[in-house]
Amino acid sequence: MSATQNYGTGRRKTATARVFLRPGTGNISINNRSLDVFFGRETARMVVRQPLELTETVEKFDIYVTVSGGGVSGQAGAIRHGITRALMEYDETLRGALRRAGYVTRDAREVERKKVGLRKARKRPQYSKR
């Protein structure tokens, strides 16, 4: 990889994002679609932009992302995690601010499996005393 590009892998739930930061004007491209086209929900777009706004690098980089697996929320979280890692590769002094905001830590929460005899992971059938 060239020195003009920084890479970060982000994961959240079952989603995985590969993020490339290149010097540019602030374009964010996800699976060859713009951020606004890829994410219909404003909250998901906001989550993706959080590390850039925190480090004040919104219009400093063009970001190219390939993301797979999971749903909207998981993919947005994975992209945020990937951008955070790529920013730390670009400039290690940003780590402290990103850590305090909670973006560096991989959110380890996963879906709990369904158990035999239960309706869902924890929901039980109605109990009848008689």
From Swiss-Prot:
One of its GO terms (molecular function) is RNA binding. Keywords: Ribonucleoprotein, Ribosomal protein. GO terms for cellular component: cytosolic small ribosomal subunit. GO terms for biological process: translation. Pfam families: Ribosomal_S9. The keyword Ribosomal protein applies. The keyword Ribosomal protein applies. Gene3D superfamilies: 3.30.230.10. PANTHER family: RIBOSOMAL PROTEIN S9, SMALL RIBOSOMAL SUBUNIT PROTEIN US9M. This is Small ribosomal subunit protein uS9. The gene is rpsI.
